[in-house]
Curated annotation (Swiss-Prot):
Annotated protein name in UniProt: Phosphoserine aminotransferase
Gene that specifies this protein: serC
Annotated GO biological process: L-serine biosynthetic process; pyridoxine biosynthetic process
Cellular-component GO terms for this entry: cytoplasm
Originating organism: Campylobacter jejuni subsp. jejuni serotype O:23/36 (strain 81-176)
Binding sites annotated in the UniProt record for pyridoxal 5'-phosphate: 75-76, 100, 148, 167, 190, 233-234
Positions with a binding annotation for L-glutamate: 41
């Protein structure tokens, strides 16, 4: 029997995708070989590669103004590639909403970029999304869409005339997005859209001009990968294959509007369970900024019970509920692949646990 996996990433995958990958692992489409064994230059793999890119654009409703790049190095490499490629001679503005924006700021500073933190919620242990106004003449404005550790999420992105950069790693492909002022939108795919080893970057083509004539190593230059259709070097072929299956699955769900509707229902059920616990459970994030993806909470009346909660949950068939080491507590990551019945199972366990130990 499969466990209910609430891990923050790598995370649970739809069973249909795992079963299809299992079926095709040794014999892809009856061809007598695995997709992992063939050259990335073959037509067979190119169909997967380019098909995945087109499906990703279709899900977000993007036209040819955007390039889709498949890169390695995780989202963390983007912390350096973004300022390397997109910083000009002005100020790069960041909103600091958690660990991942702090890391991005640090990488830009290492590169000698003129970085300004224009908003931060660090003084309240990142329990909310701070109000932010970016200057129109900044080189770019940078935000993290969803904060995996602290359980906060932008309900709407800031409106700005300067190019907006969005790290969407932990709410990738979970809802429709207004791209009207987004210049670069990226994430590692291992939370909501595949397995580890692949990053997907949507970059507006006019931004690629900034990479021209810069002294950047070829592998770190967005233009290199755009001009070579993300095939400059050997890509992570199996991760791209799995990403392609995820794109098919999302389209079969009815697209991102339907996925968002389901995600909203799941989150509402879990937050209601916390809010109606008479203070036994307490969420970390302010209600207005609660994440639909990561629900971080404590056993407020006795935090010593939290390891027992995790242990008993595992015995009941639920894994990945231990909070991040920085924040502690309990965290349920309720990504796309989890269904409403699985959230209901968690809520029933939470009520039973409260009944035993309140």
């Amino acid at each position: 029997m499969r466990k209910i996996n609430f891990s923050a990433g790598p995370s649970t995958l739809p069973l249909e995708i795992l079963e299809q990958a299992q079926k095709e692992l040794c014999d892809y489409q009856g061809r007598g070989y695995s997709i992992m064994e063939i050259s990335h230059r073959t037509k067979v793999f190119e169909e997967v590669h380019f098909g995945a890119q087109e499906k990703a654009k279709k899900l977000y409703g993007l036209n040819d103004d955007y390039e889709v790049l498949f890169l390695q190095g995780g989202a963390s490499l983007q912390f350096a590639m973004i300022p390397m490629n997109l910083a000009l001679n002005g100020v790069c503005e960041y909103a600091n909403t958690g660990v991942w924006t702090k890391k991005a700021i640090k990488e830009a500073q290492i590169l000698g970029v003129n970085v300004k933190t224009v908003a931060s919620s660090e003084e309240s242990n990142f329990n909310h999304i701070p109000r932010v106004e970016f200057r129109d003449n900044a080189d770019y404005a940078y935000i993290c869409s969803n904060n995996t550790i602290y359980g906060t999420q932008y309900q709407n992105y800031p409106k700005t005339k300067t190019p907006l950069i969005v790290d969407a790693s932990s709410d990738f492909f979970s809802r429709k997005v207004d791209f009207s002022n987004i210049a670069l939108f990226y994430g590692g795919v291992q939370k909501n859209a595949g397995i580890s080893g692949l990053s997907c970057i949507f970059i507006r083509k006019d931004m690629l001009e900034r990479s021209k004539n810069k002294q950047i190593p070829s592998m770190l230059n967005y233009l290199t990968h755009a001009e070579n259709q993300s095939l400059f070097n050997t890509p992570p072929t199996f991760a791209i294959y799995m990403f392609n299956l995820e794109m098919d699955w999302l389209l079969n769900q009815g697209g991102l509007d339907k996925v968002h509707e389901k995600n909203s229902q799941k989150a509402a059920m879990l937050y209601e369970c916390i809010d109606l616990s008479n203070g036994f459970y307490k969420g970390h994030a302010d209600k207005k900024d609660r994440s639909l993806m990561n629900v971080s909470f404590n056993i407020a009346k006795n935090k010593d019970l939290e390891p027992l909660f995790v242990k008993e949950a595992e015995e009941a068939g639920m894994i990945g509920l231990k909070g991040h080491r920085i924040l502690g507590g309990i965290r349920a990551s309720i990504y796309n692949a989890l269904n409403l019945d699985q959230i209901k199972t968690l809520c029933e366990f939470m009520k039973e646990f409260q009944g035993k130990y309140a």
